Amino acid sequence: MFFEFSKVFGFLLAPVHVLVIGALAASLWPYSGKRARSFRLMQAALALLLAMLLAPVGNLLLVPLETRFPPPGSDLGRVDGIVVLGGAVDEVTSGGQGHLGVNSAAERLIAPIALLQRYPQARLVFTGASGSLMPGIQKEGDFVRQFWHEAGIDKGQVLYEEKSRNTYENAVFSKALAQPKPGEHWLLVTSAAHMPRSVAVFRKADFEVTAYPVGFKSTGSLGHWYVPRSAEGALGNVESAMHEYLGLLAYYLTGRIDDAFPAPR
């Protein structure tokens, strides 16, 4: 039930949806004789929306997440394996078109291609089935297989874990599939904002990994002030950040991670 609850509440608590719900509630209050309170709520919702559109709110929220685990640098030493978390495939578009369609996390699928050129002996694990509540959605791995094969990755070099539906299951199921040995060096590839929660659940699963963050969306600095270039990007960054903060809180409260805001060791 955790998976279902997390998806439903995650959808309802997305910033834009909260504002819409607040605006709808405010529109109904005048009929209960509370016009002043209704007007204030509408003003607050509009002010928050304008702040997210005209100020780098998303950047301010993303920077602490994306800078928590910095890129490891060019000298990674020996690399025995690479775990790539799913979430880059737009399953609805891919299923409808019949070929790979990606979202803003596409770099998760691109980075391993270059990594395997540098570390051809490394094993590659892709973990992720579908994070959708809708039945009949085609699994991410079906599209990733074809994409990586066309990119020149040997099919025999990749293990596909296709049962996991969330980050916690990514860690547990990929460890069972990869069976990492003591002393092996594994990289974890996922979006930079997603890395704190991801590393934490892999630690909980006793699968030691080195963070290899990709797909940065922030400037990396809290002092960088700018006007977002698009409403979609501005609201998307806020939603991505809030999704991770809520995910960290939910995982910590349910014992899926040991630290509320994990840090490098």
Provide a role label for each language-model segment.
Residues 1-9, 57, 61-65, 242-249:
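Hydrophobic alpha-helical segments of integral membrane proteins
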